[in-house]
Regions:
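Flexible "cap/lid" subdomain of the alpha/beta-hydrolase fold that forms the substrate-access gate
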Residues: 2-23, 37-45, 50, 63, ...
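The serine-hydrolase catalytic nucleophile loop
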Residues: 57-68
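Short phosphate-coordinating micro-motif centered on Lys-Gly-acidic
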Residues: 26
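Per-ARNT-Sim (PAS) sensory domains and their PAS-associated C-terminal
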Residues: 31-34
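Structural cue for short, hydrophobic secondary-structure segments
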Residues: 53-56, 80
């Protein structure tokens, strides 16, 4: 099945500050053939440990720009994927293509592709909703060593709640979501250049 998607041009990322890390792409992850997945992969490929950094909504891997150097200084490898719909990854056009399983399975396929082991899973916001469920997958469980959990939770299978519904309604009613300004509300020390970087995708 082909999924129609949009792609942010590379030129949109030329002015992104403090984020000069190797970007990798794959358009052949099993189950996602034709969709381009993007991720940052920095540090030694043969490092004995890896930090896997999962961003939330509505950000992208740029969120980790200040943490990546700290992780790299420890001698570790750092992998920070952009979920589909965010950052440098393709953005499926149809709303129904976005589901929990769609995002979760993308992460599992990427971990398998890169054969990541001794993982410190770093999760924030929606990255936690997705990432904290990865260890129940038999193929992932033996790869995980540590967790860093920030500003997130894990669902209980009940209704999403008023806060989620309010966010969803806001996002659906806003034709051009001001991502940089949304992030800046909770992070008032951001520069205008950093705010623009959140808007880049």
């Amino acid at each position: 099945m082909t999924i129609e998607a949009l792609r942010t041009p590379d030129e949109a990322f030329t002015a992104v500050p403090d984020f000069d890390y190797p970007v990798h792409y794959a358009d052949d992850l099993p189950g996602y053939e034709g969709l381009r997945a993007a991720w940052i992969d920095a540090g030694p490929a043969d490092a004995d440990r890896v930090f896997l950094c999962l961003h939330g909504e509505p950000s992208w891997s740029f969120l980790y720009r200040r943490m990546i150097p700290v992780f790299l200084e420890s001698g570790a490898r750092v992998v920070a994927p952009d979920l589909f719909g965010f950052g440098r990854s393709d953005k499926p056009v149809r709303q129904q293509d976005y589901s929990f399983d769609f995002h979760r399975n993308h992460l599992l396929r990427l971990v398998e592709r890169l054969d990541l082991r001794n993982i410190t899973l770093v999760v924030q916001d929606w990255g936690g909703l997705l990432g904290l469920t990865l260890p129940v997958d038999a193929g992932f469980a033996g790869r995980l060593s540590r967790l860093i959990v920030m500003n997130t939770g894990i669902g209980q299978g009940e209704s999403p709640g008023a806060g989620f519904d309010a966010w969803k309604n806001y996002a659906l009613s806003t034709p051009d979501l001001p991502v940089g300004r949304i992030i800046a509300r909770g992070t008032p020390h951001l520069t205008e250049q950093e705010i623009a970087a959140y808007d880049a995708p």
